[in-house]
Amino acid sequence: MCGIVGFIGEQDAKEILLKGLEKLEYRGYDSAGIAVQAENGVVVYKEKGRIAKLREIVDENVAASVGIGHTRWATHGVPSKVNAHPHQSTSKRFTLVHNGVIENYELVKKEYLQDVTFVSETDTEVIVQLMEQQVSTGLSVEEAFRNTLSLLHGSYAIGLLDAENPNMIYVAKNKSPLLVGVGDNFNVVASDAMAMLQVTDQFIELMDKEIVIVMKESITIKNLQGETIERAPFTAELDASDIEKGTYPHFMLKEIDEQPLVIRNIIQKYQDENGEIELDQDIRNAILDSDRIYIIACGTSYHAGLVGKQFIEKFAKMPVEVHVASEFSYNMPLLTERPFFIYISQSGETADSRAVLVQTNEMGHKALTITNVPGSTLSREADYTLPLYAGPEIAVASTKAYTAQLAVLSILAADIAKAKGEVLGFDLTHELGLVANAMIELCDQKEEMDALAKQFLATTRNCFFIGRSVDFYVGLEGALKLKEISYIQAEGFAGGELKHGTIALIENGTPVIALATQEHVNLGIRGNVKEVVARGANPCIISMKGLEMEGDSFVLPAVHEALAPLVAVIPLQLISYYAALHRECDVDKPRNLAKSVTVE
């Protein structure tokens, strides 16, 4: 959600900022803007809509080597040019961009800013107006910045320009991701490393409640008490080509095709020198010492957690509960004596999951994060991390991170099973290799997927996904993919629940996508298909080879039944992709959605 960039050096700041914002588009946004320190003061450009629209209004003739930029995803105030960042104080001395949510902004307005006329509806404008108010009391800019931050409750990543000190950028972070990048005679600010790989791969990770004074030749980190902090930069393990589409029309299609390679990469990363699965002994011991596992996640990661529960309970014979993070915070269940928590998040920055992690850390419970970003907030604050090794995922709708989560969860379950002496009954690494082969086969059948999307989804207003056992969980993910990028009202249901209410929604021509990959429930789901067909539904049956029947729409290559979810989801991803194309939707950047949900 949202993105911040900043640059100070000798190059053209405008172009670097705009390119940086383009690299942050995947995070989701509805408006964008930049501010640069020009010869005659700070110049602000901002627009509602895409960055391409912002580019059109930026004056190429304005020379500037210092600036900040922002992509906004509306939380306070409607998407508009007025509410877009950067925001300025009344005198225009201070210009600010902000990610996060200031929870007490209305109270700050009443107590400190009663005489200020506000231009926007945002909580962000309170910060920049408060800065001006604090400086007016005689404080230095740095003192005023610290005072301002101490009065704010909530999350923030801030970039601030001072027209009277044009050779520096003030930065602050609390509960919202922010990095400072290090260059040769220049420095940068970014919400994540991808934004500034164009100029540097050296970054300093900021911690909560830290402020930074960024100059062309120096970076000074301090805490809110004014004490200086030393921290060395790290090298971003990314290449600029990792975040390019290459020959693909969309990132989503590229990332779907990358899934076989991701699975093979995961196998390699989690094997020991003998080719055996081997996880960190500390993780294994912590789980074995627990009496119940609690999986906490949101969205696609939650669906991965549901499948992960099946892996752990069937392989390792340990009880597992799966909870939506946003609900867990406010309705915590009765915990067992020795709980172990697993947090699943592609970005590692999901605010709802982090809120639960803070709670469980305070309670003294051990936690593991499964994430695609090892240096992320969840990774830092949990006791242990299992990386996904999926590479950057740019499309808002998750594909390769989801199957990577399933693969890592299966490996975790198998490792615990081995430690407990449970017999798995098959070679997991071998079977995952077969999964990768099956994925390649499926990714080569795009024409068939396109035809199914056109037949069932191109013009429909709604769609239902049904499945039994683990197929139900895969159906939930398929429904989410479809609604995310095609805007079709899609819902996933357990096949046996149809007759308890949902079947009332079936009309003539209603598309129903049924999954049949599990032998023990194959006849049950076939019966459910007959029920909806009798009410006029248009069924699309996706079955596993060996379980197929006459009339099935698509047959998946055979893999071990336990790992079927990794394969069954591929056609659902592709069908959703092509449905979105047929409906002329923005596949990579669907409306109202953000890749990294960093506010609760």
Swiss-Prot record:
Principal subcellular localisation of the protein: cytoplasm
Pfam short name (any one): SIS
Record-linked InterPro entries: GATase_2_dom (IPR017932), GFAT (IPR005855), GFAT_N (IPR047084), GlmS/AgaS_SIS (IPR035466), GlmS/FrlB_SIS (IPR035490), Ntn_hydrolases_N (IPR029055), SIS_dom (IPR001347), SIS_dom_sf (IPR046348)
This protein's record includes keyword Cytoplasm: yes
Gene Ontology process terms (BP): carbohydrate metabolic process; fructose 6-phosphate metabolic process; protein N-linked glycosylation; UDP-N-acetylglucosamine metabolic process
GO cellular component: cytosol
Ranges of residues in domain Glutamine amidotransferase type-2: 2-217
Keyword entries, A-Z: Aminotransferase, Cytoplasm, Glutamine amidotransferase, Repeat, Transferase
Domain called SIS: residue spans: 283-422, 452-590
Recorded superkingdom: Bacteria
Subcellular location: Cytoplasm
GO MF term list: carbohydrate derivative binding; glutamine-fructose-6-phosphate transaminase (isomerizing) activity
Active site residues of this protein: C2 (nucleophile), K595 (for fru-6p isomerization activity)
Catalysis performed (reactions): D-fructose 6-phosphate + L-glutamine = D-glucosamine 6-phosphate + L-glutamate
EC number: 2.6.1.16
Gene3D superfamilies named among the record's database cross-references: Glucose-6-phosphate isomerase like protein, domain 1, Glutamine Phosphoribosylpyrophosphate, subunit 1, domain 1
Enzyme class: transferase
Protein function: Catalyzes the first step in hexosamine metabolism, converting fructose-6P into glucosamine-6P using glutamine as a nitrogen source.
Subunit record text: Homodimer.
Protein name, UniProt field: Glutamine--fructose-6-phosphate aminotransferase [isomerizing]
Organism: Bacillus anthracis
Upper taxonomic lineage: Bacteria, Bacillati, Bacillota, Bacilli, Bacillales
